[in-house]
């Protein structure tokens, strides 16, 4: 028998160790007595989220990399080929771009459990320039990063539609004032408040893109996050830039949707919440959308785009 000791960060709780037959083992002087294989199960403390689903550092001899699975409300990892005393460290790994983000407000570098439980993919870590924690109405105490929804909004709402309907295209609401800030949440809130002051009930038949982004329900926005909103110009540029480092492949792991045009593998036109203080010949105000990898198109409010939302965690 070998000694297995476990050290864990404080976000992990309810740790149990079982042998190959499934028998739960008891601590013996701070260690578990194990054979050549065992399974470690644990949960994540709700008040410690957002956090990693678990990253393991092993000191000792085991035969394979440790990967986490999910079963019956626990996260699990199996150790095999144990042939010496082993110290297992369960670490709360910091988030990285391209990590999967899950509806329980956790993240992982690989897909764990049901892919439909994945809210989306992290496309930026840390607070973006111009984003302010005070804009989030007390929903967040810190900005850890940003997540792009796993499925296009068109799956829920149908075909691509213009930024807003004709009645509202000659309005300049004010989101044009910060074109280079990560302020999609503040922009979205400004547009929602504008509609409210006008006595408008938000729907697909007025401020279409804001309605679709904030009413998106195909993938869950976890409690403890901002909730879904329509990203700003620079936020959606960052999503497109992530194309070059593999966000397309990550999205396709957790979604069956066609996220790029089949002919050239470019992005769909992604809608943004950032206006432009210019008008076209019809008097319609401008809007930015994302036409290609990292390229913002100078469009107008009668242009059709896909307003797939983002969230802040």
Where are the language model's segments positioned?
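Conserved N-terminal submotifs of small, disulfide-stabilized extracellular modules
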Residues: 1-31
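Conserved "repeat-terminator" motif of extracellular CCP/Sushi domains
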Residues: 1-9, 70-94
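Surface-exposed interfaces of beta-sheet-rich extracellular modules
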Residues: 6, 37-78
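Extended extracellular/luminal ectodomain segments enriched in beta-structured repeat modules
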Residues: 35-37, 225
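Short, surface-exposed beta-strand/turn "edge" patches of beta-sheet domains
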Residues: 62-83, 284-301
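Short, compositionally biased
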Residues: 91-224, 304-312
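An exposed tryptophan-centered "aromatic clamp" motif
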Residues: 192, 198-229, 233-303, 310-312
